[in-house]
């Protein structure tokens, strides 16, 4: 930006909550001049802190930005069951009986929760916001609505499920896998798929 206090124009797509890890985060920046995507990735990783690695860089057209194509619409997560709340490193397998309980939980006509907003608190049916899920041996997979129109956090889903089965105090750990937006056909795709790599001759 310009003015008396110039700074980088940058933002994060759906910033990650405290206590979560992630395999797929997105940073949106404006550049003053073109740069080759591979070179940009190499230069960023050379000065990055431990635990943060830039994987790729793509350019998104102004048309897609202007039409709202880059607005996030979904995220998917892994939910791990912990031995205790003291460490996220010691995990245990998902109980086999949870699979049947989860199917019963999702088969409800509605899944009503009290959801807080900045101004109020209201009862919301979160079932339509759960786009997909699967109980695996090592973790629970969740595919949830994310963004300005609808936003469902994985901890709210799991808190509601654990209350449903009477195990509210179960310690869990969350890892986000990726963030998605809708393409021109309305299909959910990773944000990266909306752009193209930059190649400078």
Positions of predicted regions on the chain:
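Helix N-cap motif at beta-to-alpha junctions
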Residues: 32-37, 84-87, 147
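Short amphipathic alpha-helices in soluble, non-transmembrane regions
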Residues: 39-48, 90-108, 157-158
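Ordered, amphipathic secondary-structure segments that act as subunit-interaction surfaces
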Residues: 23-78
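Short, charge-patterned binding micro-sites
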Residues: 2-32, 65
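Short amphipathic beta-strand starts and helix->beta connectors
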Residues: 6-15, 57-66, 119-132
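Terminal, regulation- and interaction-focused segments at domain boundaries
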Residues: 27-30, 72-94, 98
């Amino acid at each position: 930006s310009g003015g008396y206090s110039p700074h980088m124009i940058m933002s994060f797509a759906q910033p990650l909550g405290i206590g979560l890890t992630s395999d797929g985060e997105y940073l949106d920046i404006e550049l003053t001049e073109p740069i080759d995507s591979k070179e940009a990735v190499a230069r960023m990783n050379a000065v990055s802190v431990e635990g943060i690695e830039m994987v790729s860089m793509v350019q998104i057209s102004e048309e897609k930005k202007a039409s709202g194509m880059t607005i996030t619409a979904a995220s998917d997560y892994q939910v791990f069951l912990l031995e205790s709340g003291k460490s996220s490193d010691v995990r245990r397998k998902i109980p086999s009986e949870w699979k049947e309980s989860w199917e019963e939980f999702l088969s409800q006509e509605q899944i009503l929760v009290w959801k807080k907003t900045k101004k109020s608190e209201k009862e919301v049916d979160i079932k339509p916001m759960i786009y997909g899920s699967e109980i695996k041996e090592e973790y629970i997979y969740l595919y949830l609505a994310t963004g300005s129109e609808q936003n469902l956090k994985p901890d709210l889903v799991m808190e509601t499920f654990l209350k449903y089965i009477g195990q509210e105090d179960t310690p869990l750990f969350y890892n986000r896998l990726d963030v998605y937006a809708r393409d021109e056909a309305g299909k959910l795709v990773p944000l990266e798929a909306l752009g193209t790599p930059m190649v400078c001759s």
